[in-house]
């Protein structure tokens, strides 16, 4: 920071990239779950140090985002990174945490008058819950009032299109 390096670049090109590399090492069986958890702790410490230096974009006009990890999944590294980016973008972020019951996503979109709903999962076994949430939004007449963003390792454009999400990461 003192040398002129942007905090966001440090997060994206340093911490996120490092976590991605750790993930690949885990896939290649060079890292164990304990190694990934240590890397995640280091990444969170780095984000905490850089977060106060992020330039906040105040163009979001007080928009609200609801974010959480879908029911049945407790992997929240990606969710926490997206949360930081949304906050940096000027959004009010309502973080539901991990292993969030499907109905809670819909209830929170309604009670918070959310502009964006972000759902995350790292597991293929919990992906279908995202589609259930989108259908529940339709049933309550909320789907056209909120942008739905889904993300996680198993998520593809095909899946996002299939369930009616607006975008994926």
Q: Residue spans of the language-model regions?
A:
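Long amphipathic alpha-helical segments
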Residues: 1-57
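Cofactor-cradling patches in redox/metallo enzymes
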Residues: 82-89, 94-165
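Alpha-helix N-cap/loop-to-helix initiation residues
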Residues: 32, 74-75, 126
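Surface-exposed alpha-helical interface segments used for non-catalytic interactions
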Residues: 12-13, 41, 80, 84, ...
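Short glycine-enriched loops at secondary-structure junctions
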Residues: 16, 70-73, 99, 154
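Glycine-rich active-site/cofactor-binding loop and its immediate structural neighborhood
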Residues: 60-96
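Long, low-complexity, intrinsically disordered polar/charged segments
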Residues: 54-69, 134-138, 144
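Short acidic-hydrophobic, aromatic-tinged amphipathic segments that line or gate anion-handling sites
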Residues: 167-169
């Amino acid at each position: 920071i003192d040398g002129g390096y942007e905090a966001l670049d440090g997060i994206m090109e340093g911490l996120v990239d490092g976590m991605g590399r750790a993930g690949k090492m885990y896939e290649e069986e060079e890292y164990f779950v304990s190694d990934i958890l240590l890397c995640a702790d280091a990444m969170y410490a780095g984000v905490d140090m850089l977060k106060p230096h992020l330039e906040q974009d105040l163009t979001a006009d007080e928009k609200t985002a609801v974010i959480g990890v879908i029911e049945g999944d407790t992997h929240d590294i990606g969710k926490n990174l997206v949360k930081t980016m949304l906050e940096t973008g000027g959004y009010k972020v309502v973080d539901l945490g991990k292993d969030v019951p499907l109905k809670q996503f819909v209830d929170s979109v309604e009670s918070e008058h959310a502009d964006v709903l972000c759902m995350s999962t790292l597991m293929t076994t919990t992906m279908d819950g995202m589609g259930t949430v989108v259908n529940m939004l339709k049933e309550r007449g909320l789907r056209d009032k909120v942008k739905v963003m889904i993300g996680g390792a198993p998520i593809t454009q095909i899946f996002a299109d299939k369930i009616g999400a607006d975008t994926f990461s």
